[in-house]
């Protein structure tokens, strides 16, 4: 298959691919820049690299350049601690990290995009096609594409089953998991999203979710497959985002529930040009749904995973009006079912489709992930008689705070290493702003300084993972077989 960006440069070259409000790149511009950079990246002789990047045009150029150079990209969550980043990258044998943000990480070759020069200049200069720096182009049907000469040609096609990106996820026990996402996975996800949500070449999608998350990267993939425009934004600011919605003909936007709430508080009381507001990352409250629908906002709730390359369940406004607790119906190109449903129809959600990863890169010895071709999500769900899917527990003990997944096992492991703590468990605590925040229960025979404990945890965990609530207890609830009864702490 032709590289999607190459195809768009040929067929849709003058259409705006990406804009940050200051600079805009057509698909021709984007392909030109990515191709030039790709030739330089090849000199590093890496088949897999880490990316430590922000939401910027230069980051998007870097992503496409890596793919044009046949380099797999391992996305790094910029909120992680150096130790967490190191463990992730070493587990998948990454030796070199390209970055658009300052980074110091021992044990790796760190290369800033600002330091990569090609054809006598820096990538950060906007290179238009009338200044091609020695690369020859030919014109056909008013579209300018590189001539295919041995001295400058890059691969313009790829194998759908090659790994495009790698992201890390985790269960609540055990090590972090490396998820390989192939071009086929991304393509199937984009097609499923187009059918269930809807977008076309005239779409103008505001993307403020981090590119290192699948929710952010998937917008870029949908754009380059379909040929629409992405309005990239690095930081969420409700006032600024609302101004963009009003003034820049934004048709689509991806948000987590809390950011939608902030936008409504800021004054998003009508849709303007918005056709779709795609929500995910945390549960929607019935109150928020009611308020949004009263404003005629086109909200679409969704459910997806890193392993499924973003959403595979989508609820339309009509579905949410009928049943506010639903995450909708599956995309047409996936199949879902409930494993071992109880008398209420609740059981583990299983999914099968081309959007689903094949196997974890790390650890390599995981079992029980697939059953007869179906991926076991580990989420407790129900499918009603109309086909609506309800998620009741997202991996049960997984904490979702402001769209970020927080894994209790990591917090508990660090807490148990603090002097004086003999046992600890972390659960989600309700929070009006973030949905949930971590709460740590711990057992200790001595007095523990909360300030010292927080300082210790902050040394080993990303800031958003540090518990916001603490409670000292005499014992933790275990069954006779030694299984921790987290549900008693949720109620407690």
UniProtKB/Swiss-Prot annotation:
Gene Ontology cellular component annotations, sorted alphabetically: membrane
Gene Ontology terms describing biological process: menaquinone biosynthetic process
Keyword Ligase among UniProt keywords: yes
Cited InterPro entries: AMP-bd_C (IPR025110), AMP-bd_C_sf (IPR045851), AMP-dep_synth/lig_dom (IPR000873), ANL_N_sf (IPR042099), ATP-dep_AMP-bd_enzyme (IPR050237), MenE (IPR010192)
GO molecular function, one term: o-succinylbenzoate-CoA ligase activity
Reaction equation(s) it catalyzes: 2-succinylbenzoate + ATP + CoA = 2-succinylbenzoyl-CoA + AMP + diphosphate
Pfam families the record matches: AMP-binding, AMP-binding_C
Pathway: Quinol/quinone metabolism; 1,4-dihydroxy-2-naphthoate biosynthesis; 1,4-dihydroxy-2-naphthoate from chorismate: step 5/7; Quinol/quinone metabolism; menaquinone biosynthesis
EC numbers, comma separated: 6.2.1.26
Enzyme class: ligase
Keywords (A to Z) from UniProt: ATP-binding, Ligase, Menaquinone biosynthesis, Nucleotide-binding
Keyword Metal-binding: no
Annotated family: Belongs to the ATP-dependent AMP-binding enzyme family. MenE subfamily.
Function in brief: Converts 2-succinylbenzoate (OSB) to 2-succinylbenzoyl-CoA (OSB-CoA).
HAMAP family membership: MenE
Name of the protein in its database record: 2-succinylbenzoate--CoA ligase
């Amino acid at each position: 298959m032709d590289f999607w960006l190459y195809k768009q440069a040929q067929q849709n070259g003058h259409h705006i691919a990406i804009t940050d409000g200051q600079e805009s790149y057509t698909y021709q511009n984007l392909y030109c820049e990515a191709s030039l950079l790709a030739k330089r990246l090849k000199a590093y002789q890496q088949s897999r690299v880490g990316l430590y990047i922000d939401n910027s045009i230069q980051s998007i150029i870097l992503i496409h350049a890596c793919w044009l150079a046949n380099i797999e990209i391992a996305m790094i969550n910029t909120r992680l601690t150096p130790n967490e980043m190191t463990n992730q990258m070493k587990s998948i044998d990454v030796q070199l990290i390209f970055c658009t943000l300052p980074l110091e990480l021992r044990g790796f070759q760190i290369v800033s995009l600002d330091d990569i020069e090609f054809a006598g200049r820096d990538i950060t200069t906007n290179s238009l096609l009338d200044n091609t720096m020695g690369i020859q182009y030919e014109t056909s049907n008013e579209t300018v594409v590189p001539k295919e000469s041995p001295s400058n040609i890059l691969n313009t096609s790829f194998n759908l089953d090659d790994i495009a990106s790698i992201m890390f996820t985790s269960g609540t026990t055990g090590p972090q998991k490396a998820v390989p996402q192939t071009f086929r996975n991304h393509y199937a996800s984009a097609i499923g999203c187009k059918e269930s949500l809807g977008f076309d070449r005239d779409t103008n999608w505001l993307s403020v979710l981090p590119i290192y998350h699948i929710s952010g990267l998937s917008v870029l993939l949908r754009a380059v497959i379909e040929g629409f425009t992405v309005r990239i934004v690095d930081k969420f600011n409700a006032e600024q985002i609302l101004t963009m919605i009003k003034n820049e003909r934004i048709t689509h936007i991806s948000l987590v529930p809390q950011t939608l709430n902030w936008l409504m508080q800021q004054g998003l009381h009508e849709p303007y040009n918005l056709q779709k507001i795609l929500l995910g990352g945390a549960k929607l409250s019935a109150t928020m749904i009611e308020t949004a629908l009263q404003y005629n906002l086109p909200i679409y709730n969704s459910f997806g995973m890193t392993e499924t390359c973003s959403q595979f369940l989508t609820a339309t406004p009509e579905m949410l009006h009928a049943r506010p607790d639903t995450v909708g119906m599956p995309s047409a190109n996936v199949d879902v079912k409930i494993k071992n449903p109880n008398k209420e129809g609740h059981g583990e959600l299983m999914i099968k489709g081309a959007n689903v990863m094949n196997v974890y890169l790390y650890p390599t010895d995981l079992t029980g992930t697939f059953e007869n071709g179906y991926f076991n999500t580990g989420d407790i769900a129900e499918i009603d008689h109309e086909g609506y899917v309800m998620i009741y527990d997202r991996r049960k003990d997984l904490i979702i705070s402001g769209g970020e997944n927080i894994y209790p096992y990591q917090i508990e492991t660090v807490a148990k290493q603090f002097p004086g703590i003999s046992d600890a468990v972390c659960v989600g605590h309700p929070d009006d702003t973030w949905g949930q925040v971590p709460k740590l229960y711990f057992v200790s025979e001595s007095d523990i300084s909360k300030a010292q404990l927080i300082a210790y945890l902050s040394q080993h965990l990303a800031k958003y993972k540090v518990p916001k609530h603490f409670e000292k207890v005499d014992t933790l609830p275990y069954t006779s077989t030694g299984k921790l009864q987290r549900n008693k702490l949720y109620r407690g």
